[in-house]
């Protein structure tokens, strides 16, 4: 799609959102190398991108896999060197990195989510807390969205690389993209949550989507960040997601990337509307950031779908 058409549709969405007072902080559209258009309804700021973080964390894992430090078949048992708690469910040893990346660990509930963490869930030791949980279903069988799965995947990366997740992410992703040290939520023992709460500005947040749009290469410098094969695999349907009436939740899930209801499209997606959608056939990325807790998230998501993403892809 040419820039002029994309900008016209973008401007229409901005005017529509302004006219209706939709609670949006900022929205941007770009290709693999630059921002085509950007609008801030409020002053641009660094803010939590919530579960959009998961796509950054899984990319770090994809890099480690490309380096031969991990495989998708490595098991959670490796993190504790085969020394599971005596009362642990024996099926925990069967949970693979693939299961964690596809939200199919088998724990059967959403653990270490925002409300739980704020209430002290998992303290003081998140890893021990999860290793004492029963496995409800066979690992790898059913999708169940849980930030605990991403946290455990991050602990597997730390075990394999000998680095904290934040350091590895900075060295292999943030620094090459020209970004600073990741400000991130950590557990009481200093391990990054993995699945939530990196803080970024709008156009920083969407950089990982621009890298994926370009097959793993950061176009402004020509530097490869992650293997093209990982980009293709991570953004392909790896597991089915439950039926939903909302826009885009039932299209399937990759490795911490949601599939979207547009041709070949996928997205990194965080609570309250922190979203970067990749539209490969149009060569575009659309990113949006929204405020917390106002109850309008579904309205904004639907408007984004109807007024910008659908017109861009039809």
Where do the PLM segments sit?
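Active-site helix/loop module of the DD-peptidase/beta-lactamase fold
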Residues: 67-107, 132, 160-200
